[in-house]
A protein has these predicted regions:
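Blade-level signature of beta-propeller repeat domains, shared across WD40, Kelch, NHL, RCC1
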Residues: 237-263
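Conserved blade-ending motifs and adjacent loop-strand segments that build the rim/top face
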Residues: 109, 221-242
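Asp-box/WD-like beta-propeller blade repeats and closely related beta-sheet repeat scaffolds
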Residues: 1-40
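WD40 beta-propeller blade-start loop/N-cap
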Residues: 24, 31, 107, 179, ...
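Aromatic- and glycine-enriched pocket-lining scaffold segments that form the walls
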Residues: 35-54, 78-79
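Beta-propeller domain segments
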Residues: 3-5, 52-225, 255-256, 262-263
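Beta-propeller and closely related beta-sheet repeat lectin domains
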Residues: 35-38, 113-115, 185, 236
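Short coil/turn segments that connect the beta-strands within blades of beta-propeller domains
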Residues: 44-45, 122, 199-200, 243-244
Length: 263
């Protein structure tokens, strides 16, 4: 049986020492799929930690399919957690008052691959792998339920039949649903000065699509358009550098760090 943990150590430029476990995800599981996680520090000093749903069918946890744990508030699986810097539940997590585990900040997630904060608006964005199709870009809010597996644009890997409905009352729709799947990865919100027309846009790396997706947003965070930047290699992460340029890290035998510039 396996699980995910949050650990802390000190990196001296060559190695990590003093490793200690700060937090362990509840509900051990079998299999080697869908652990998580992405980490994101917030301005208040708390940490967001994404945890995946536990795995694809036929994997089960108890008498339920593993993926159904994303709708179970008594487990951390399929959720984003908000923790203090010592691994404790952060105060004010809204679902605790409804009986959820106190660390849970949002739920109904399948397998988050990118997590980023817009430094201007403060909005939190996440990219998420769907099953067969139905990858998502979500605007994540505290207390939100993002539907998996009841609400999804994806299909079952084996049967290719829909897993859930496209819309379910009380659950939050994705800002973007990608069908077919680009297999999104790392995520960044651009606020630099090198390409002013891109300010405020979300950039998502693509593993299967071998590209970067730019999602343009208006001031309210609504999607106004999309562009595709062909890279020709699996893109594992996208980040804005301190110099204001956008960088992409490829996931290949001979991986590269690429700087994106305007033509």
């Amino acid at each position: 049986m396996t699980t995910s943990s949050l650990v802390q150590g000190v990196f001296d430029g060559k190695k990590v020492t003093g490793i200690k476990t700060l937090f362990k995800v509840s509900t051990d599981k079998s299999g080697g799929q869908h652990f998580g996680s992405r980490l994101l520090w917030l301005p208040d000093g708390t940490l967001l930690m994404s945890v995946a749903d536990g795995g694809n069918p036929p994997l089960r946890i108890g008498d339920r399919l593993a993926r159904e744990q994303a709708q179970n508030p008594a487990t951390h699986l399929g959720s984003i957690l908000r923790l203090t810097d010592d691994g404790k539940p952060a105060p004010g997590n809204p679902l605790a008052a409804k009986g959820a585990l106190p660390e849970i900040w949002s739920m109904g997630h399948r397998n988050i691959q990118g997590l980023a904060r817009d430094p201007v608006s403060g909005r939190i964005w996440a990219t998420e792998h769907g099953p067969y199709g139905g990858d998502e870009l979500n605007l994540v809010v505290a207390g939100g339920n993002y539907g998996w597996p009841l609400q999804t644009y994806g299909a079952d890997y084996q049967t290719h039949q829909p897993v859930g409905k496209h819309e379910v009352a009380g659950m939050i729709n994705p800002s973007v649903a990608w069908v077919p799947s680009p297999a999104p990865s790392g995520l960044a919100v651009y606020s630099g000065d090198k390409i002013p027309a891109w300010r405020g846009s979300v950039f998502s790396g693509g593993l299967a699509a071998k590209d970067i997706r730019r999602v343009a947003l208006d001031a309210a965070g609504q999607v106004t358009g999309q562009d595709r930047l062909a890279i020709g290699a699996r893109v594992r992460d996208v980040k804005q550098g301190p110099d204001g340029y956008l960088y992409a890290l490829t996931d290949e035998d001979n991986g590269k760090l690429l700087r994106i510039v305007a033509k």
